[in-house]
């Protein structure tokens, strides 16, 4: 009996340590209303992005009658929906990518070191929690935070690392990167 209680306490401690490695950002909070027989019942909806700043990121949505409870639900949802994104040199994207969700479209471009995060609102929160330090991003169409976050995740999902491209083509990564560097020189010579 005492051993079970001890083990449960240790599990909780490990879980708290694991949770502390994540950085969370509140992207949007919104007051919502449910129409009931007696009138309107007001609550809150929260959109949270969470990440470990090392390539794992997730987003979650939560609704509750009180703001802190909505944020907690959104954070729990984000922890359940974590995805891994391959980063180049641990600081930027491997290539330029495009993502869309609904009317929201985003363009993400890899950037040289020292550029910083050039992105607006919800996209900036995703990049900061993901650990990207250099990126240029542009959103076109819907400015709805939910659509922008989902479009950003859609774009990140379509990114390929050189290792995955090389595996798909059955070639070595060094060959692929030599073509990438040498390809520009060959085009200039022609």
Curated annotation (Swiss-Prot):
Entry's Gene Ontology cellular component terms: small ribosomal subunit
InterPro entries membership: Ribosomal_Su5_D2-typ_SF (IPR020568), Ribosomal_uS5 (IPR000851), Ribosomal_uS5_bac-type (IPR005712), Ribosomal_uS5_C (IPR005324), Ribosomal_uS5_N (IPR013810), Ribosomal_uS5_N_CS (IPR018192), Ribsml_uS5_D2-typ_fold_subgr (IPR014721)
MF terms in GO: rRNA binding; structural constituent of ribosome
SUPFAM superfamilies documented for this protein: dsRNA-binding domain-like, Ribosomal protein S5 domain 2-like
Domain named S5 DRBM: residues: 22-85
HAMAP family found in the cross-reference section: Ribosomal_uS5_B
Domain notes: The N-terminal domain interacts with the head of the 30S subunit; the C-terminal domain interacts with the body and contacts protein S4. The interaction surface between S4 and S5 is involved in control of translational fidelity.
Name assigned to this protein: Small ribosomal subunit protein uS5
Organism: Bradyrhizobium sp. (strain ORS 278)
């Amino acid at each position: 009996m005492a051993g079970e209680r001890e083990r449960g306490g240790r599990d909780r401690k490990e879980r708290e340590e694991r949770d502390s490695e994540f950085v969370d950002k509140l992207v949007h909070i919104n007051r919502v209303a449910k129409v009931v027989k007696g009138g309107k019942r007001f609550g809150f909806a929260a959109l949270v992005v969470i990440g470990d700043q090392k390539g794992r990121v997730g987003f979650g949505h939560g609704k509750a009658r009180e703001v802190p409870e909505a944020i907690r639900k959104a954070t729990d949802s984000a922890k359940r929906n974590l995805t891994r994104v391959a980063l180049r040199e641990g600081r930027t994207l491997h290539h330029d990518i495009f993502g869309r969700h609904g009317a929201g479209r985003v363009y993400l471009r890899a950037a040289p070191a020292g550029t910083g995060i050039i992105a607006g609102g919800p996209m900036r929160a995703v990049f900061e929690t993901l650990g990207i330090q250099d990126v240029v991003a542009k959103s076109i169409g819907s400015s709805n935070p939910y659509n922008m976050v989902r479009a950003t995740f859609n774009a990140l999902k379509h990114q390929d690392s050189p290792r995955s491209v090389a595996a798909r083509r059955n070639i070595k990564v060094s060959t692929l990167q030599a073509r990438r560097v040498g390809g520009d020189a060959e085009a200039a010579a022609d």
